Structures are given as structure tokens and as C-alpha cells.
Amino acid sequence: MKNQHTENKQLPKLVVILGQTASGKTDWSLYLAKKFNGEIISADSRQIFKKMDIGTAKTPGEWRWDGFKKTYYVGDIPHYLIDFLDPGKYFTSAEFHDQAIKYTKLIHGKNKLPFVVGGTGMYIQSFVDNYKMPRIAPNKKLRRSFEEKSEMELLEWLKQVDPISAEIIDQKNKRRLIRALEVSILSGEPFSSQQKMGEPLFNILQIGIKKEKEDLHQNIERRIDEMVKLGIVEEIKSLLKQKYSWDLPSMSGVGYRQFREHLEGKETLEQALEKLKKETKHFAKKQMTWFKRDQRICWSETVEDAEKLIEDFLKK
């Protein structure tokens, strides 16, 4: 769906690097940001959380003073919207939209090129199309009634009130199911129909990383094996000890919830890992289903292809 959002040459430019989990976004974005004097805004709904590094495959970095504020650096590249939120807190797509716009303007103010990098499709689309998002406050009473339902029961309910969201949502993520239902019920409109495009703010090039399924699955398996070596089980135990519960948004995502039965003595570690590998591959498939809806994305197999796309984009 072509529209003026990516074609308005008068607007400030930015580049989006998107792709499935374990597709190589980090390496590409660091190389390209260095090449084109850029800074990075993370569009990853899991890497926003502090204390959650291994299960989110967060890019190792450090907080440094940058003028009067601290900024997360990976090497010499500043990163925003990463490692900043307590795991007990909530962060909506609407909040991401607002914060990403703020940091994009900050980066432009330094005469640098903003790179928005991640795999959270809702974050990216809300930003690219300047969505006017539903601002429905969480309803504790409604949420308590939802919590008593299983994921399958919630999904069946969502299919009735919002079949579009039901098709593309992470069906094992109870938090997201609850939020989609909550917004649909309290507003009286399907969650998926409430995201309206606003006026374009930026001239945007979207680059997607194209990865063969077999290669991607090998990357996923390697990453999960590495997570165990790095101490994912110990990371989760530490979070539970700090009273972060399994029903929090931070703990209900891929990379964490799959270890619950193991830590409760109901599964072996090997069973938990097999489940994580299977569900991560399914999650990657869902990501691609989301991205394929946007015909404006330029798919690249190599970082050199992406580099050429950016060079041409900046010349226009």
C-alpha cells in the first residue's frame, strides 16, 4: 500500500531496519549507523526492559553520560528506547509512537540519520504511519475477569470482536490478547480498526532483512543454546526472586514464559528449550506475516544491498 508517508521528499529522512527474530538486525544496524553517521531507536517490545538481557537477546552496551542525561551506547552508537523500563511496568504502542517521534527529532537535531531498528511490527507501523492510537486506560476489573480465562478462550472471544487482530496476534501471549479485547470492548470498536494514519512526519525508507527459513531456524536454535550458556535460567530466577510475576508483560513474552513449567518442576530443561525453539520459530513466522502486509518494505539479502538502498535514498 503505497502512500505519501514514504514518498514525501520534503520531510526529514530516516531509515527503518526490520526483520524477524535472529535475522541479524543488530549487526546490520550497527554497521549501517556507523557508515551513515546515524543513531538507533530500538523498536523491540522486549528489549525495553531493564534486568532482562539474556532472554531478550539485548545488544550488550553501557549507559554513559551524554551531556546532562544518560544514554545507552553500543560501541560508539547511541541507542534509545532500550533497557530503560522496570519489568513491572507497562509500555504501550502509543507510548512507543510518541517516544520514537521525540528521539527521531532529537537525532535530526544533531544532524545525524535516525535508524529505527526492530521486529515489533505494531511499534514500527504505528511510527511509520504516524498512527493515532487508541488511548484506552487499563481496566483492572475487566482484566481480572480476563485473567481467569485461558489463552484459547481469550482468542476465541477475540475472533468474535476483532477477527483481524486474532489472525496476527501472538496467540500464546495472554497480555496482548487481553489488551486487544480490553480496547475492543471498552471502545465498542475492533482494536485493529482504531489505528488511523495521521499526517506524515518523516520521509522513510523501510529495509527488511530477507532470510531463508532454514538459515533463520538455525540462527534461532544457536541463539537459544547460547542463552542457556549465558544463564537464562538464573536470570529468570533472579527476576522471580525480585517479585516479578509470570503474568507481567515482561515475563509473558517469548524467551521467558517457556521456562515456567521447568522452574515449577513440571518439565525438564530440555523440554523447556524444545518448547522455546518451537514457539520462537512460530513467532518469527507471525512477524513475517505482519511485515508482508506492507508493500513499501524493500527486502534485502545482504547488508551491502541495504547500504546501496540507503545511499540512493539519501541522494534523492
Where are these regions (language model features)?
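Phosphate/pyrophosphate-binding catalytic cores of soluble transferases and nucleic-acid-acting enzymes
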Residues: M1-K316
